[in-house]
Each structure stands twice: as structure tokens, then as C-alpha cells.
Amino acid sequence: MLNRVVLVGRLTKDPELRYTPNGAAVATFTLAVNRTFTNQSGEREADFINCVTWRRQAENVANFLKKGSLAGVDGRLQTRNYENQQGQRVFVTEVQAESVQFLEPKNGGGSGSGGYNEGNSGGGQYFGGGQNDNPFGGNQNNQRRNQGNSFNDDPFANDGKPIDISDDDLPF
């Protein structure tokens, strides 16, 4: 039997982080996931799916994601129930997120307010935070930041100038 859920969507609000009495972190958030089809008026509808993640990942989700952030979730569907204050049985279905992927660069947050954690300076690294997170040495992160956070680091990008290549330089 298989119980596997894979979702890609945007957070509808900031994640809520709390701690159990045993000290385990738990974060809850809701993903808005577009349906693959449109309704009769041609508009795309969305499903709003509650997700839960635990421990270190819960803290990372709370620190780096916010309303509008694009995230990928891999987990399993779980149902639970409890009795509310009126004595009624309430059933809850949610995704237990085993893995949460941040699908946008830190400074490209979906809500337009500038990123996951503005104080974090790890260029392109979600959990780094240090000035030199590159395990191979060097300062590529600092060089990239000094270029005005340009996302177009492609040396072959068209900058409007003609390319002068002779036929002798081509390998074919």
C-alpha cells in the first residue's frame, strides 16, 4: 500500500510555529495548489491543503517561508480526530510533510516583500547564513552579491553586441 503526497504551491499565510510539551517544534501551514483544469468561466481553481512538519524542518519552514512563498512538499496524508469544546467530534485531514523544498531564491519571495529572511546573507543557500558557505573555498557567494544580485550569470547571454566567430573556430 502506498500513501504518498507531492505538492507544489504557495503559502496562504505565514507558517505557525509552536512547541510540544516535550520541546519538539511543529509548524503548520496551508498551501494553495492550482488545479490542472479550469472551471466553466475559464478560471483556474485552487485547493487549500493543510500541512504539518516537525522538529528542525519545522523551524526552517517558520524561519524561511512566509505568505506567498513557493514551496514543494513531499509527505503522506494523515487523518486525526478530536473532541471540540462543544463536545463534537472533529475530523482533520492534513499532509505530514516529510520534506519541504523552498522553490524560490531567498530574495525572490512570492509576496513581493523581499525574501525569506532579510538578515541572512548566505547567497543562494537556504540554511547557510554565513559569509563563506562554499565548502570548496573561494568567495563566489560574495562575488555574486557584489554584482547587484544579478540572476543572469550566463556568460553566453545576449548583451546586444554581435558575436565575432570565424568558421575556423567552430568544431563542425
Curated annotation (Swiss-Prot):
Plays an important role in DNA replication, recombination and repair. Binds to single-stranded (ss)DNA and to an array of partner proteins to recruit them to their sites of action during DNA metabolism. Associates with oriC, this requires DnaA. SsbA binding to ssDNA prevents DnaB and DnaD individually from binding to DNA. Has a 20-fold higher affinity for ssDNA than SsbB; SsbA and DprA activate the homologous DNA strand exchange function of RecA-ATP. Enhances the activity of 3'-5' DNA helicase RecQ. This is Single-stranded DNA-binding protein A. The modification Phosphotyrosine is found at residue 82. A motif (Important for interaction with partner proteins) lies at residues 167-172. Residues 107-131 have a biased composition (Gly residues). It holds the Pfam family SSB. One of its GO terms (molecular function) is single-stranded DNA binding. SUPFAM superfamilies: Nucleic acid-binding proteins. Residues 132-149 have a biased composition (Low complexity). The C-terminus is required for interaction with a number of interacting proteins. The C-terminus acts as a hub to recruit proteins to active chromosomal forks. It is found in: Cytoplasm, Nucleoid. The keyword Nuclease does not apply. It comes from Bacillus subtilis (strain 168). InterPro entries: NA-bd_OB-fold, Primosome_PriB/ssb, ssDNA-bd.
